[in-house]
Every structure is written in structure tokens, then in C-alpha cells.
């Protein structure tokens, strides 16, 4: 790796860090050192720490040639910033070091597997852009410094089976299976504009061979599938993909960029994955490109980019960086669904506690002690025929608010941040089909300074959105059209 280009990028990042105060960042969500970030990458455990890398353009708040930023954590909540890990520089990645994953090798080194995007010609195409291709590459390091593999790329367009694109071939997710072999799933667009997930295999993580097509979109479930993840949890195999150009299906799937998970059976001998069901992974506004890992204590933990692509070109005025990650989430499989919960470590940061039991709500009501922008709050709503609508206002004052509303007749939960202060907000509202569980709708709401993550009915559904509301707007209120009954448990989170 070119020491000079990496040194320049690291020095620039260090200078930019001085411009951004801790108060301008979230308390417990990962952000870039400066500039732009998107997909989480290289999520892994190495040398007694969690490592998270991310797609990174440190030089501006807009997407640009992708670098890899880097943070570490002991507990998945508070993160230490390390020098950025990779810069685009070689012929095979001079357009960008795109998304990938990480794993510890048997010899104790840390391996990063990523997509290198390189120019193949200096003659522009019809759209004025220079043609590129995408290949899979490696970098090996000690947890701080990484060297790109001298024989990169290790998987090229020549390894793509017939009918596949050499241009859209990206986002390798690597793991080591019980048979001692390394495997990687890679997203690939087909010649007809659809997508498929390719499976590759290696004895040493350096020399790879194509195995099979694991699954494909087949003119359904969007076009290009990005950022695949494949794992087993609670006896069920799960394939997670982030489709582009998704078509809506009622309130189940939403239009545009999305994230879905496909559950099924997987034969580890024949490598045949038989799909059984498809569900949305998050039904909110800002959630994309999730990546998971298995923790040393056996939990499956996932993190995602907390941003919507359609809004990403409209950076709010005055923002000194753009993009953040979700809170890591524990994943389980129960009753035919993936269940998501905030990682349990967040509970170690709980402070002041307020509890209300069976409070009747009609007109707009403020509960003493229930306010703030950094909190962990659970609201249990009894679903009866005594109200037509129930609303929670968050991050509110006389000018701003964002709302969570439940309609018990339609069984629809609605998010609305049109009054949040996010100018030019293309996606500002989302409706989600939510059925009561045991006569109640339970909402666990995790707020940070610039986000809201909602875990619905014990994590059977989730909804995520960012907020660019001034921090002074920290009121919370409850209201009902009719009479509703709620219980509230609210913890302030302290850091």
C-alpha cells in the first residue's frame, strides 16, 4: 500500500477531527472522522476488540472515491477512532475500495476482503464516465495497519459464471465454516439486469474457486442485490441482501433501496440454499447495507448504515460530517421471524429511571421526567376500541417534532419527521403494518442526538430514522384521539 497516499489521508482526517466537537456527534452511534460514510465493513472481533470499518470519503460530505475508515470497541457501544485503514491507489482499486468484510486468520493476522473498483480504460463511455470493473481483493494487517495482498485481485470477472456482469460484482462477506474452509458470498448483476448471490470457497482465504449461485432475484425483489450476508442463527439459515430498485408490495416492502432477509434451508455438502420466506429487515426510513458477526459469547450481532440513499444528496446546512451507523443489534430467529434487540451492553449506560403504569391519555400529555434526546424508553400501548389514533411526539418544541402514530383500526404504525427540520427531505414518512401482540403494541425507542431506532413488539419488527433537529428540541408528549392507556419505562442514557 502506498505509504504516502495513506499518510496524507490520515493526516487530513486528524486535522478535520479538531473541527468537530463531541457535542456535534452522537453519543453512541459510529460516525466518520470527517466527510462522508456509508456501508459498514469488516465487522469482526480481533485482539479482544470489536473492529468496524466503513465506506469513507474523508475529503467531503459527498460520496467519492471510497476509503476504509476504522473504529474499535470493547463493548459495541463506545468506540475508539483508529487511523483510516485503506485508500484507493492500485490499478485494481483506484476508483475505490468498495465494501467487504473481515476475519481473523489461523495465524493470528486480520484479513480484510473487499471489492476493488478499477478503471479499465481512459476512453469515456456514452454517459461520460470512464469504464470500470469490480474484483475481490485482500488486505492483511495487525488491527491498525494493513497491507494489500501482492497477488490482488483474488477473484476476478473471469471467475463469474456465464450471464453475469464483470462491472457489478461486489461486497464479499467472508466466514470460516465447520469444515475448515473459508467461504464468501458476493453480489453479482446478471446480463438481464437482475441479481444473484455467488458462493466462493477457499482452503486458505487467498486462493478462491467458484461454487454455485446461492439465490437470485429473478425479476422480483428489486434489481441489483448489494451487501449480502449469510449465516445460521437458531437453526435457520438467513441470507440478507440490500436490493436496489425495489418495487413496493403493500406496506411490506417499500419502493427504492431496501433491505430484506430470505430464510431457508442450506445443505453444507451440496451448498444448495432453498428459500422458504422473505421479509423486510427494517421498515423505517434510514437503514441499509447491514453486516453481522458472531461475538465470542455466541451472539449474532448486526450493524447497518443509518441513512437513506435518496436523501443522501441533501446534506443539512452546517453539518461537518455525514452518515452514521445504527446501534448494533442482537439477532435471533423465533416464530418464523428474525428478532432484533439492541445489544444488551447498552443497558450498562442506563441512568435516571422513570416509570408510569396504566396512564390514561387523551389530550396531549407530558409526563414528568419523560423527555430528552439520549434515552432508552419502552411504551406499552393497550390496543382497544376506545381510541382511533395514538401519537408520540419526539424531539419536540414549538417549532419542531417527529411523530410515531398508531392506528388501531388499520393496524398501521406511522413515522413522520416532516417537521424535524431536515430540509429537502425526500423520504420523511413511512407506514408499517403492525399487529398487536397480546392486545398490546410495545415500542422500545432508542434515541441518540440525531436518530431514533424503534424495536416493535419485542423486536419482531424495527423502524429506524435519523433526525437533524436542533438539540434544544427535547420534549416528548403523548396524545390520543379518544382514550388510550399506556405504561412507560424511560431511562436516560449517560456517557
Positions of the model-derived regions?
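Beta-rich carbohydrate-recognition and catalytic domains
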Residues: 1-171, 176-220, 234-283, 306-356, ...
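Beta-rich accessory regions
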Residues: 10-16, 263-495
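Short, well-structured alpha-helical interface segments that form or flank functional binding sites
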Residues: 38, 225, 287
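Short gly/pro-enriched beta-turn/loop segments at secondary-structure junctions
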Residues: 169, 223-225, 234, 259, ...
Amino acid at each position: 500500500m502506498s505509504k504516502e497516499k495513506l499518510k496524507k489521508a490520515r493526516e487530513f482526517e486528524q486535522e478535520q477531527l479538531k473541527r468537530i466537537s463531541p457535542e456535534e456527534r452522537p453519543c453512541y452511534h459510529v460516525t466518520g472522522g470527517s466527510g462522508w460514510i456509508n456501508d459498514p465493513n469488516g465487522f469482526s472481533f480481533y485482539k479482544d476488540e470489536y473492529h468496524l470499518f466503513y465506506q469513507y470519503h474523508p475529503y467531503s460530505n459527498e460520496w467519492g472515491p471510497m476509503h476504509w475508515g476504522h473504529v474499535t470497541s470493547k463493548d459495541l457501544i463506545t468506540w475508539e477512532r483508529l487511523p483510516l485503514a485503506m485508500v484507493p491507489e492500485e490499478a485494481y482499486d483506484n476508483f475505490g475500495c468498495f465494501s467487504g468484510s473481515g476475519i481473523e486468520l489461523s495465524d493470528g493476522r486480520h484479513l480484510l476482503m473487499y471489492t476493488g473498483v478499477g478503471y479499465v480504460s481512459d476512453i469515456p463511455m456514452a454517459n461520460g464516465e470512464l469504464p470500470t470493473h469490480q474484483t475481490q481483493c485482500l488486505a492483511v494487517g495487525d488491527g491498525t495497519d494493513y497491507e494489500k495482498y501482492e497477488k490482488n485481485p483474488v477473484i476476478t470477472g473471469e471467475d463469474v459464471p456465464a450471464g453475469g456482469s464483470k462491472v457489478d460484482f461486489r461486497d464479499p462477506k467472508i466466514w470460516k465454516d465447520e469444515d475448515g474452509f473459508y467461504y464468501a458470498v458476493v453480489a453479482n448483476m446478471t446480463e438481464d439486469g437482475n441479481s444473484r448471490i455467488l458462493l466462493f470457497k477457499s482452503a486458505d482465504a487467498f486462493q478462491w474457486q467458484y461454487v454455485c449461485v446461492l439465490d437470485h432475484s429473478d425479476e422480483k425483489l428489486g434489481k441489483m442485490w448489494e451487501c449480502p450476508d449469510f449465516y445460521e442463527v437458531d437453526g435457520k439459515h438467513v441470507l440478507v441482501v440490500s436490493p436496489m430498485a425495489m418495487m413496493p408490495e403493500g406496506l411490506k416492502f417499500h419502493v427504492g433501496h431496501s433491505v430484506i432477509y430470505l430464510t431457508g434451508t442450506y445443505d453444507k455438502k451440496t451448498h444448495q440454499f432453498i428459500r422458504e420466506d422473505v421479509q423486510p429487515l427494517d421498515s423505517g426510513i434510514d437503514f441499509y447495507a447491514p453486516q453481522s458477526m458472531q461475538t465470542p459469547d455466541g451472539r449474532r450481532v448486526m450493524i447497518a448504515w443509518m441513512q437513506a440513499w435518496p436523501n443522501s444528496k441533501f446534506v443539512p446546512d452546517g453539518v461537518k460530517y455525514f452518515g452514521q451507523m445504527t446501534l448494533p443489534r442482537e439477532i435471533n430467529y423465533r416464530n418464523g421471524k428474525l428478532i432484533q434487540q439492541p445489544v444488551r451492553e447498552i443497558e450498562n449506560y442506563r441512568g435516571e429511571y422513570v416509570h408510569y403504569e396504566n396512564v390514561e391519555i387523551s389530550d396531549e400529555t407530558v409526563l414528568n421526567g419523560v423527555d430528552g434526546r439520549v434515552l432508552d424508553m419502552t411504551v406499552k400501548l393497550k390496543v382497544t376500541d376506545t381510541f382511533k389514533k395514538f401519537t408520540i411526539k419526539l424531539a419536540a418544541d414549538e417549532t419542531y417534532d417527529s411523530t410515531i402514530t398508531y392506528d388501531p383500526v388499520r393496524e398501521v404504525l406511522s413515522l413522520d419527521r416532516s417537521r424535524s427540520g431536515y430540509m429537502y427531505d425526500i423520504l420523511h414518512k413511512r407506514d408499517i403494518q403492525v399487529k398487536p401482540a397480546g392486545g398490546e403494541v410495545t415500542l422500545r425507542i432508542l434515541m441518540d442526538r440525531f436518530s431514533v431506532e424503534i424495536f416493535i413488539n419485542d423486536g419482531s419488527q424495527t423502524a429506524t430514522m435519523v433526525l437533524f433537529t436542533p438539540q434544544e428540541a427535547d420534549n416528548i408528549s403523548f396524545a390520543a384521539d379518544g382514550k388510550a392507556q399506556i405504561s412507560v419505562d424511560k431511562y436516560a442514557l449517560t456517557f
